[in-house]
């Protein structure tokens, strides 16, 4: 009898389809598992994440990362908001979130993993072979050094709303979309956001509030579009 890795079994049993209306293929499931193993191994020597238990890793890292691109996990999402997604950037990727799960889920996207800490960039480079990903491009540097060449920008846990807009919106081509991954979100946040958007020739597309599937924590994803 072949014994299976219990962590892999747990990952398979989480409610992907019920909560994302999307199910990873066996290859993607294996890539998530290899990413988990690589992250745990590297985490012993550097501070990549405090979230290591399997249920927490699935919900707070994998699920949360993919929830931000939920519109593009559906068959109808390819032309959503008039955006054809090919070039993606994860700003402040850290241990690879949300960029690596996104790259696994969407192998047809080219995902730049932008990180300001060289040690973390080295880890991100190692994931290409460790996880079997040919569509991730780790880069060391800051957002300000990148031009307007991206169709989709993702920014998670990087400062306040003003800083997120300043980092993300200038990187987008006309029609490109910025996804802000946020915890709590208030009417005051929306009002503040509306004062920021004109300077970037951008508009608010949607604000989606939801609860996480295991811990039932409140989360929001904010979708903004560059218009000029």
Curated annotation (Swiss-Prot):
UniProt: S-adenosyl-L-methionine binding residues: 92, 97, 115-117, 143-144, 156
Keywords: Cytoplasm, Methyltransferase, rRNA processing, S-adenosyl-L-methionine, Transferase
S-adenosyl-L-methionine among keywords: yes
Highest taxon in the source lineage: Bacteria
Cellular compartment(s): Cytoplasm
GO molecular function, one term: rRNA (guanine-N7-)-methyltransferase activity
Pfam family for this entry, one: GidB
Record-linked SUPFAM superfamilies: S-adenosyl-L-methionine-dependent methyltransferases (SSF53335)
EC number: 2.1.1.-
Keyword rRNA processing: yes
Main location, first listed in the record: cytoplasm
Gene Ontology cellular component list: cytosol
Function per UniProt: Specifically methylates the N7 position of a guanine in 16S rRNA.
Family recorded in the similarity comment: Belongs to the methyltransferase superfamily. RNA methyltransferase RsmG family.
The protein's name in its UniProt record: Ribosomal RNA small subunit methyltransferase G
Taxonomic source organism: Thermosynechococcus vestitus (strain NIES-2133 / IAM M-273 / BP-1)
Gene name of this polypeptide: rsmG
């Amino acid at each position: 009898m072949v014994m299976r890795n219990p962590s892999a079994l747990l990952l398979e049993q989480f409610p992907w389809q019920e909560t994302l209306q999307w199910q990873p293929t066996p290859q993607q499931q294996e890539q998530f598992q290899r990413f988990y193993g690589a992250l745990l191994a590297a985490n012993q020597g550097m501070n990549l994440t405090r979230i290591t238990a399997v249920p927490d890793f699935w919900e707070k890292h994998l699920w949360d990362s993919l929830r931000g691109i939920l519109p593009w996990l559906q068959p109808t999402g390819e032309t959503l908001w008039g955006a054809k997604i090919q070039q993606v950037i994860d700003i402040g990727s850290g241990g690879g979130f949300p960029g690596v799960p996104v790259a696994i889920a969407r192998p047809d996207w080219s995902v730049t993993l932008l990180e300001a800490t060289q040690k973390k960039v080295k880890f991100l480079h190692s994931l290409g072979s460790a996880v079997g990903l040919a569509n991730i491009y780790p880069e060391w540097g800051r957002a300000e050094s990148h031009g307007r060449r991206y169709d989709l920008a993702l920014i998670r846990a990087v400062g306040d709303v003003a800083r997120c807009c300043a980092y993300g919106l200038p990187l987008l081509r006309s029609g490109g979309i910025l996804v802000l991954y946020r915890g709590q979100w208030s009417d005051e946040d929306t009002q503040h956001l509306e004062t920021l958007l004109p300077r970037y020739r951008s508009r608010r597309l949607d604000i989606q509030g939801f609860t996480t599937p295991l811990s039932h924590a409140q989360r929001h994803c904010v979708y903004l579009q560059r218009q000029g």
